[in-house]
Amino acid sequence: MSATLQASSTTKDSPISETEFATLIDNEKDKLTDTHEFIRSITNQLSVKSSKFKFLVEVTSVSSSESITTNVTITSSIGSLWDDERDGYYSFKVQTKDVYLVTVYWIYAD
């Protein structure tokens, strides 16, 4: 299953498009079982997209040894002071055997 967008900012100057990031996640999703390796691979690929931005990648995994028969609510909050026109984020859901929430944040740093 491919990565599906769950949320995003309304940034004008995104260093990577939503589609490019979804493709990047899809190409690397086999590494999600080792989140450190997945994050390292994603950040290395993002670093060549633009030297004017710093990137943060967050992975949240949702798994259970038993079948989940009810809806699960996961809440995550983050706060920042940033430039709404240059800084932003994409948050994707990736369904494999487990569910992963992958978020990339970019901050303009020129």
Curated annotation (Swiss-Prot):
A Pfam family reported for this protein in Swiss-Prot or TrEMBL: Tctex-1
Keyword annotations of the record: Cell projection, Cytoplasm
Matches recorded under CDD domains: DLC-like_TDA2 (cd21457)
Location(s) in or outside the cell: Cytoplasm; Cell projection
GO cellular component: cell projection; cytoplasm
TM stretches of this protein: none
Family that this chain belongs to: Belongs to the TDA2 family.
Stated name of the protein: Topoisomerase I damage affected protein 2
Organism expressing this protein natively: Clavispora lusitaniae (strain ATCC 42720) (Yeast)
